[in-house]
Amino acid sequence: MGMRIKLQSTNHPNNLLKELNKCRLSETMCDVTIVVGSRSFPAHKAVLACAAGYFQNLFLNTGLDAARTYVVDFITPANFEKVLSFVYTSELFTDLINVGVIYEVAERLGMEDLLQACHSTFPDLESTARAKPLTSTSESHSGTLSCPSAEPAHPLGELRGGGDYLGADRNYVLPSDAGGSYKEEEKNVASDANHSLHLPQPPPPPPKTEDHDTPAPFTSIPSMMTQPLLGTVSTGIQTSTSSCQPYKVQSNGDFSKNSFLTPDNAVDITTGTNSCLSNSEHSKDPGFGQMDELQLEDLGDDDLQFEDPAEDIGTTEEVIELSDDSEDELAFGENDNRENKAMPCQVCKKVLEPNIQLIRQHARDHVDLLTGNCKVCETHFQDRNSRVTHVLSHIGIFLFSCDMCETKFFTQWQLTLHRRDGIFENNIIVHPNDPLPGKLGLFSGAASPELKCAACGKVLAKDFHVVRGHILDHLNLKGQACSVCDQRHLNLCSLMWHTLSHLGISVFSCSVCANSFVDWHLLEKHMAVHQSLEDALFHCRLCSQSFKSEAAYRYHVSQHKCNSGLDARPGFGLQHPALQKRKLPAEEFLGEELALQGQPGNSKYSCKVCGKRFAHTSEFNYHRRIHTGEKPYQCKVCHKFFRGRSTIKCHLKTHSGALMYRCTVCGHYSSTLNLMSKHVGVHKGSLPPDFTIEQTFMYIIHSKEADKNPDS
């Protein structure tokens, strides 16, 4: 045999990553799409599976015939973009205050390299981890498969020891056995469990068995979670029947620029199972004790200071998701034809026609009518609409999409808030009660059946989809920049609206359902549908006053009854018999609140959904947000959303102890508002002219109503 020559390139790994990153940015050969909040990230399934144990577990658990789209909802889009950039470039840039959040995300995703990068940058993290002796080498072994355990008996130090992400819970197959079948090893796990030994060196390879051609279903093996198995591959995939508890959902009623959901549950909507990593309360590290997140939904009533003990809000079972709370709002989307083909339910695989009412009816089949729990993840809800909206996330069928950027949403309420997020001069929001004839002159070429692009002079048909298609011609999608002025934008929707400004065309958007129009006649017909529902539905026969809310109407009639003894039956004054069967939207809360506030001495507020009564407005508003899913307070550190001001203040104390108020001039932190006010006095003469003390709050208020009670 002649001389053997070894040819090796040190640049090959880096060049390979660069090419993969180019393919990702240009969406070339991408076989999976990760949906985080309102953004979609195309990627390569093999790259994600090799870089993060969470994705490896997720892809193997869903099977080969699963959909290409997966939802990751325990991370913000901005942070996931940074993590994805690290996967493809091995580099990550973030603020110092965000390191703790990135570190926790790396733990939940199972990204060993990112954890090591955090340890190398902050040596204190390495010293706080109670490292265990490794039982196997990490980089020389391949063909690994793991399941993160949710058992609290494993301290985080064991999971971070050395170069192994999951410590003793993650075991490796020797290189000679890397080509073995995963299904084969899974069947041998149970038989090898009784023969596993703790050895100080890598174990011998497991015995070979006959090959199995038929794939075996993934099963949960709770007994394997209590002890590490050496010489085998731990394959206890977590399902809804395992001991892995579903994560809390952190949903909000208003959305930031980059996200509309920041939940803490790792529920894969493509399968309806909980493929979740170890819970955050089971993965606390003393080194990051000050940055640990506090699940404020688990606080007792005394901690909230104003909560009614009868509400049981502090129970760990309660998970409130975004809900439109109105059956009528969904009716507007039936004619939109957003989904032109039947889609399978990701829970039971039943093929569902693209009809909103049928899909919602099918969602009720996955709700236990006796207990009010979700049959998929056993989450409990108090009201029916929240249950249905929650189950829609398991079904995995997006019912609504943005006309401009085609971002998918589960509810119309989420879509409407997404469109309200950006303010653009060429996007004119039209309300149902606005006079349309006065806006006729704002339409580009109102008297002409065609439109003309001001950027290139091309003649376009007066159709929004044609205009949208032409906008893409003036975009640099790869660089996410405008081809006319080279301005870059963080998200596609704002970029497309910006590019539309160069075209000289105005688009009118419906304030109710976010539909867009460039033809005045179509807009007029569409708004007529909303105007018929926006008209006053309740009329008083005594004084000719009109009301949109049944609660406000009934209270008004009760005043007549007190004064003149007239009949005030519940149906008195109804002009439309169909209203007896009509379910009122969520505005019934607001109508009742306003009616009761207007009367001095009245200290009771009654919820029309559950019948509970409250003595103060703050209590009633907090309770109302439970039914609507609104969380108007957002933490500036970890971007989580909360219902009340008291809860966000308690949460801020978990970030380094006293991140309550931050000076906008020098960045100084204060624990109380009085201390911050005194500190601001030092900067007299250098403060901006529009400075207000509210700018120092370490939380964002997304609701004007919630801003009525500022800090004192």
Curated annotation (Swiss-Prot):
Cross-link (Glycyl lysine isopeptide (Lys-Gly) (interchain with G-Cter in SUMO2)): K183, K439
Gene Ontology CC: one annotated term: nucleoplasm
SUPFAM superfamilies the record matches: beta-beta-alpha zinc fingers (SSF57667), POZ domain (SSF54695)
Span list, region Disordered: 129-162, 176-224, 236-260
Domain named BTB: residues: 30-96
Ranges of compositional bias, category Polar residues: 134-147
Name of the protein this chain belongs to: Zinc finger and BTB domain-containing protein 39
Record's keyword terms, sorted: DNA-binding, Isopeptide bond, Metal-binding, Nucleus, Repeat, Transcription, Transcription regulation, Ubl conjugation, Zinc, Zinc-finger
Gene: ZBTB39
Gene Ontology terms for molecular function: DNA-binding transcription repressor activity, RNA polymerase II-specific; RNA polymerase II cis-regulatory region sequence-specific DNA binding; zinc ion binding
Zn finger spans (C2H2-type): 372-394, 400-422, 480-502, 508-530, 538-560, 605-627, 633-655, 661-683
CDD domains: BTB_POZ_ZBTB39
Pfam families: BTB (PF00651), zf-C2H2 (PF00096)
Entries under InterPro entries matching the protein: BTB/POZ_dom, SKP1/BTB/POZ_sf, ZBTB39_BTB_POZ, Znf_C2H2_sf, Znf_C2H2_type
Keyword Nucleus: yes
Cited function: May be involved in transcriptional regulation.
Cell location: Nucleus
Ubl conjugation keyword on record: yes
GO biological process, one term: regulation of cytokine production
Similarity comment text for this entry: Belongs to the krueppel C2H2-type zinc-finger protein family.
